[in-house]
Amino acid sequence: MMDFLKRFFGSSQERILKRFQKLVEEVNACDEKFSSLSDDELREKTPQLKRRYQEGESLDKLLPEAYGIVKNVCRRLAGTPVEVSGYHQQWDMVPYDVQILGGIAMHKGFITEMQTGEGKTLTAVMPLYLNALTGKPVHLVTVNDYLAQRDCEWVGSVLRWLGLTTGVLVSGIPPERRKAIYQCDVVYGTASEFGFDYLRDNSIATRKEEQVGRGFYFAIIDEVDSVLIDEARTPLIISGPGEKHNPVYFELKDKVAELVHFQREMCNHIAAEARKTLDPFLGMDVLPKDRKIMEGISEACRALWLVSKGMPLNRVLRRVREHPDLRAMVDKWDVFYHAEQNKEECLERLSSLYIVVDEHNNDFELTDKGMQQWIEKIGGAAEDFVMMDMGHEYALIEEDTTLSPEDKLNRKIAVSEKDTQRKARAHGLRQLLRAHLLMERDIDYIVRDDQIVIIDEHTGRPQAGRRFSEGLHQAIEAKEHVTIRKESQTFATVTLQNFFRLYEKLAGMTGTAITESREFKEIYNLYVLQVPTFKPCLRIDHNDAFYMTEREKYQAIVAEIISAHRSGKPILIGTESVEVSEKLSRILRQNRIHHTVLNAKNHAQEAEIIAGAGKVGAVTVATNMAGRGTDIKLDKEAVAAGGLYVIGTSRHQSRRIDRQLRGRCARLGDPGAAKFFLSFEDRLMRLFASPKLNTLIRHFRPPEGEAMSDPMFDRLIETAQKRVEGRNYTIRKHTLEYDDVMNKQRQTIYAFRNDVLHADDLFIVAREQIEHVSLALAFLILKDARADHCSLPKVEEWLSYSFPVKLDDQEIRRLGNVDAVADYIGGLLIEAFDAKFSSMLTEFTEIIGSASGAQGVCNDILRSVIISHIDEEWKVHLMDMDLLRSEVGLRSVGQKDPLIEFKNESFLLFEGLIRDIRIAIVKHLFALELSLTRSDRPDNAIPTVATAFHNHDNFRPMELTIIGEEEN
């Protein structure tokens, strides 16, 4: 029935395209109408449209004219020179109907899927122009600085011709220039540049003049799937050096390396013994039928199953897996030990290892044997694996009648410090093990100039300046014997998911989005629209070629490269890691094939390499070329030779990345072809392929070196990719659920902070904080609702120590209720505050000679005090939230939902944060002692406000310098 209705009415995509097509016709009509206008008359259309919008016309009503204007300008610019990235180019682009259609979709808030070479960059100009007419912030988000600069110079020339201003944000631009850039009508930049400016404005700026942004109205995200999906799990973090160096990584690095060495040696020994049994059968196509022989083979495969849990990449294990029958037998033991009835035997066998590595879930677990080895042979401490029960420890201290209250407090502090040290040591140990067991050099990171440089898993680019969080970076530094740097402390953080939710309107464009349409809809409320191509795609997509072993696969790839190279076709070979690209490069050198390698180690030559990749006979080996975001343009000889030939050395875990790699060829009607070569040893096949695959390869094993190619295998690959995509989607959604909790708190704190930055009278803000503290004290005093059992003595002692006020016990008891007591305490504190700052204001007025100037100085002082405590307490809160996030997962063992537990406890932490901020602010205001002095310079005095503090709590001396004018 649904199929019938779809055929009758058309799919939702078809209906939307049909509706938008009518607007395309209106745009073309406007374009023709504007052709008779002079350049000045056409430019005058921009202020006219702005006025019409201000007078109430909607952008939808203005769309046909605005898009028609852009198209007409593009036609007028044809043949004019445009300087792009230092090169002179001639403008030769006029939007096609499909580009206008894509531009309409983006204005309407769609993600437009447009194939590589279809002109997404020009398409974006139309919705950018239309939305910039509002005068509100309009941003174009790219995947790197180069594209931001290029697009601003290139298609930004259309916007500038029409009288709009454009700016580009790249790394290294100072704050004062950033502020000017944000004032432009349209701003180009990367997600990280926009995101970090948002964090700096809300966590680093101490005056409103230091804030650079002007809000979030409309954004178009180029390569939207890369930004909102691939990078969604990586938060933007502003951090600084921690207060102290954690020595645990240096202390434990050799011990952890020794434990991993024990594990490797044991697994190598087990594998070597198994190989003695299996060696005679590795060359056989069919295993013998003799029962006794098969029992021996089965036991050897059982031993290799154990090796797979200790060292999954063991060479013997990988060699045995090349034989389909032996591979099936190893996997059979895996299925056997996953069964509930065999759980005890599974645990017994795994207990013979030091560490159990779960390659599928990227995790590991130390066994009892591993712990024993750590303690007895390596010299580790038993305390490394035992956490303290703080409730029990505190109870023992309270029960000790020989201790005075002060001694009990000191004991509790000592126990708390001991617990913190144990947790830090245990955490460091786990991160060192993770670095050795799960993080691979030249895949996850490279070592350069005594530093660990992260490799972006999606683009293959080195991420200089970025560091793995939670001590993992220090652990890898220890593993690779480079300088171990201090752990960083987070000052501010936000995920890209929640950052882009700040925009009123959001749109995107990419060549591959339809496979992720569900995630775009559920998380961002964005719908994907597939835009037709301008010309039919001539790409030839060959079936995947499957090989039994990695060795056979590489032999076939080299043979294919040699064959295609003879025809003159330019060849692009896509690899998943630096390691694979360098391995393939060695093989090509051995075969004397001239080629160029583009990976994280030589990314600086990227533009030069890409420029030559489309020339006839070029061979380019590129790591994650899919994420490069740059088109490869063919010369005439390359087109005549058959166009770009794309070879994939493995399937990515995401179908979308594979589609991107295919899309690098056959752009805008050019010829081209793509083919993937796979082996059953590839990570995707090994970890996520269906068990049916083992059955198939056992029955259809081809001769050595011969490929298997069948749509059935393609479907199995797609199933494996869908399984991985589903898992990754769950992880991203899970991450977002936790960050949503943090996001609400972030918005509350940032709103409070901005109110302080923009407030004209900080005395009002200060009095509000005093009132809040007074209410909290009233609750504390009357928490039992009985004056006879209240906390009055403790509160009185604390108040007299912190503030210049003394409470009247009789008055407190007479008032009795919280509101009345709060008003009483607040009255005393506000009276003392007003007296203190009135005196200060009088003194400053005499020195400065201006009441308004003195008021400004006092406002600056109060603002500095309030902002400093918001920032300091927020940093501590971020650390507490990270700790809670890392610990709450264990609650599932007690049949509790970790997310619910996180929400409940984070709410309590946030309540405590607000209370601590207010108390710290109020205490600081009363602890402040100020003096104002003039500079000896007669022409331009600089009053210096030096603030000193009483010696209590952790207040640090601070100095403020206020620029002022000397009295004439």
Swiss-Prot record:
Enzyme class: translocase
Domain of life: Bacteria
Catalytic function, reaction form: ATP + H2O + cellular proteinSide 1 = ADP + phosphate + cellular proteinSide 2
One GO-annotated biological process of the protein: protein targeting
Keywords per UniProt: ATP-binding, Cell inner membrane, Cell membrane, Cytoplasm, Membrane, Nucleotide-binding, Protein transport, Translocase, Translocation, Transport
Record keyword Kinase present: no
E.C. number: 7.4.2.8
SUPFAM superfamilies attached to this UniProt entry: Helical scaffold and wing domains of SecA (SSF81886), P-loop containing nucleoside triphosphate hydrolases (SSF52540), Pre-protein crosslinking domain of SecA (SSF81767)
Predominant place of localization: membrane
Membrane topology: Peripheral membrane protein
Positions annotated to bind ATP: Q99, G117, E118, G119, K120, T121, D631
Gene3D superfamilies: Helical scaffold and wing domains of SecA, P-loop containing nucleotide triphosphate hydrolases, SecA, preprotein cross-linking domain
Xref: Pfam families: P-loop_SecA, SecA_DEAD, SecA_PP_bind, SecA_SW
Role: Part of the Sec protein translocase complex. Interacts with the SecYEG preprotein conducting channel. Has a central role in coupling the hydrolysis of ATP to the transfer of proteins into and across the cell membrane, serving as an ATP-driven molecular motor driving the stepwise translocation of polypeptide chains across the membrane.
Family stated for the protein in its record: Belongs to the SecA family.
Name of the protein in its database record: Protein translocase subunit SecA
Organism: Chlamydia muridarum (strain MoPn / Nigg)
Gene name in the database record: secA
